[in-house]
Design a protein with these regions (language model features):
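Short, glycine-/Ser/Thr-/acidic-enriched flexible segments
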Residues: 141, 314-317, 345-346, 438-441, ...
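Mature extracellular/periplasmic domains of secretome proteins
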Residues: 329-332, 420-423, 449-450
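Structural flexibility/helix-modulation signal
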Residues: 396-410, 414-419, 440, 494-496
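Short, conserved helix/loop micro-motifs enriched in His/Cys and acidic residues
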Residues: 419-435
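Extended C-terminal subregions enriched in glycine
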Residues: 431-471
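Short acidic, Pro/Gly- and aromatic-enriched capping/linker segments at domain boundaries
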Residues: 495-510
Length: 554
């Protein structure tokens, strides 16, 4: 077998994955990890210290949800030894997920690291929020042998429950500060779940009730499978200069990659290599996609001779300079009289990339989002530590002042240098409209906030607002490093467990100065998806956005 054939076979195996029922009971997932009593208490103690001392949204979450995660974790210590491993990890995960913050998640034992549980179809919603309809928009035909279960069929039941009720029930287990954002995430996680950041499905298979295109009721049984989608060559790397400047829903990013593996396999297979720009074509006919060496994060095509379309899939990248350079190149190849920028389901990533991109579409001077830490003895010691001088010293004085002033937070300061946000200037001369939804999160929220606060153009929102992720997220390993040498240095999380945490709280700037993003999001012009949007490549949505561009040109 030649190299190309081996590569093709490897891609097929990656897309096929393994049955979850086999992986969780066999040796594929690395076998079970038993946490002894001491390890369980160590996990709880580290989480209590970290959340109480560094979690940026703790006062707001306590007020919003009338619950106290610190007390809940403390009480869990009393019964931790009586629980099974599955019960213990689910209990910890439920407490942390109860914060409704996708930045702050418990990571269970490392046996399921990088794994995503998938069903072989994608379900999407259309119509008004009060009376939604659900249909299958994409199918992995290699994993479905029912010819009547095809894109376009309406979904009516999930394991015997009415489908809308199943979505609502699952939304109760999801992150999201608003009911609509929890429903959006539930709809996604019904068929795609990042197992590193949450428990696996209870069932090994699901029974999906649907109505065929002929109107007949039918059912199909589909097993859960597990994939390892990996990361693109352009993705962010731990330990890089950008590692502490992330704002991302890591679970949603893993799911995005898994969807790409299943439904855009050729693109997934090609994004593991870095290609120089001089090997990339710079031509595309109307309706065709432009070639790009950063196709995991960017995609662009001319919709007509007057309107271009830019898809920003994610800000998960390591090099913001390369991102901005490629973005400028793509903008120059699109029609210059109108642009639609689509950030739906963008899970975030590098803060620098999102905030620097705004300048390309406006003559305004961009003021970046500002971030602050919660004022506690722990964060004061972190900011005063010589180890953290470059990263945290700017907040040190206001953290010290908070002792006497009673302020809950340090002074908010930008993570992106304001000069970087204005070093290129406007590169796209025409009017632009941006599109977001309830799964646009984190750095996607920051882009949307900057878009609105600098009056760059209309913001169209599918759903009430963006996903409302307002923080800079750190991992447990990064937090442990930053606490090194202080009185609060934690031990290492045992058995490959860990967590992510919202460390610095985001505050809007410019016209939205002082408004938090967490749990609120960025609202825009409301839009309800149609069946034609789901089945005909966003036909009505693009027409709606084009009409807004036409108004801007008048």
């Amino acid at each position: 077998m030649n190299g190309a054939a081996r590569s093709a076979e490897a891609v097929r195996r990656a897309r096929r994955g393994v049955l979850m029922s086999e992986a969780l009971t066999g040796s594929r997932a690395g076998g079970p990890v038993d946490l002894d009593g001491g390890q369980r208490l160590q996990i709880l103690d580290i989480l209590v210290t970290s959340i109480a001392g560094t979690y940026a949204h703790l006062p707001a979450k306590r007020a919003a949800y009338a619950s106290d995660p610190v007390q809940a974790l403390t009480l869990l210590r009393r019964r931790a030894a009586d629980l099974s491993d599955i019960e213990f990890n689910r209990a910890v995960s439920a407490i942390v997920t109860g914060l409704r913050d996708a930045h702050t998640r418990y990571i269970g034992p490392s046996t399921l690291r990088d794994q995503v549980a998938v069903l072989p179809f994608l379900v999407e919603q259309y119509g008004p929020e009060s009376r939604p309809k659900y249909l299958v928009s994409k199918i992995n035909t290699d994993a479905v042998d029912d010819p009547e279960f095809q894109p376009g069929v309406e979904l009516e039941a999930w394991n015997g429950a009415p489908f809308a009720r199943a979505v609502e029930n699952h939304a109760d287990l999801e992150t999201g500060g608003r009911p609509d954002s929890r429903r959006s995430r539930a709809l996604e996680s019904l068929t795609f779940r990042a197992l590193e950041y949450g428990p696996p499905p209870d069932e090994h298979w699901v029974i999906v009730g649907y109505r065929t295109k002929r109107g007949r009721k039918a059912e199909i049984r589909l097993p859960w499978r597990m994939l390892t989608p990996g990361k693109a060559a352009t993705a962010g790397e731990p330990g890089s200069r950008a590692a502490l400047k992330q704002a991302s829903d890591l679970a949603a990013e893993a799911v995005r990659r898994a969807k790409k593996l299943v439904f855009a396999t050729d693109l997934w297979a090609s994004d593991h290599e870095r290609r120089p720009v001089d090997e990339v074509s710079d031509k595309a006919e109307v309706g065709e996609w432009l070639d790009s060496p950063m196709q995991d994060t960017l995609a662009a095509r001319p919709l007509s001779r007057k309107v271009g379309y830019l898809r920003i899939w994610s800000f998960d990248l390591d090099d913001d300079d390369a991102f901005i350079t490629e973005l400028i190149r793509l903008l120059g190849l699109l029609p210059q009289t109108g642009l639609i920028i689509d950030l739906r389901a963008n899970p975030g990533g590098l803060i620098w990339a999102a905030e620097r991109a705004l300048q390309l579409f406006t003559d305004a001077t961009i003021q970046p989002t500002r971030f602050s830490m919660i004022a506690t003895p722990l964060t004061r010691q972190m900011a005063d530590s010589p180890f953290n001088r470059l990263e945290l010293e700017a907040w040190s004085q206001s953290l010290q002042d908070a002792v006497s002033t009673g302020e809950l937070y340090a002074q908010p300061l930008p993570l992106t240098d304001p000069s970087w946000c204005n070093d290129q200037g406007r590169m796209y001369p025409g009017p632009s409209v941006a599109v977001v939804d309830a799964n646009t999160y984190s750095s996607g929220d920051l882009f949307a906030a900057g878009w609105v606060d600098h009056s760059i153009g209309p913001l169209v929102s599918v759903g009430q607002a963006t996903g409302a992720g307002g923080a800079n997220v750190w991992t447990s390993a990064q937090l442990r490093d930053a606490l090194s040498g202080t009185d609060h240095q934690p031990g290492r999380m045992p058995a490959g467990t860990g967590f992510t945490i919202a460390f610095r709280r985001a505050i809007r700037s410019a016209a939205g100065d002082g408004i938090p993003i967490e749990d609120l999001g960025i609202p825009g012009i409301p839009y309800e998806m149609t069946k034609d949007d789901l089945m005909k490549s966003n036909k009505d949505l693009l027409a709606f956005c084009s009409s807004l561009l036409g108004e801007a040109n008048e």
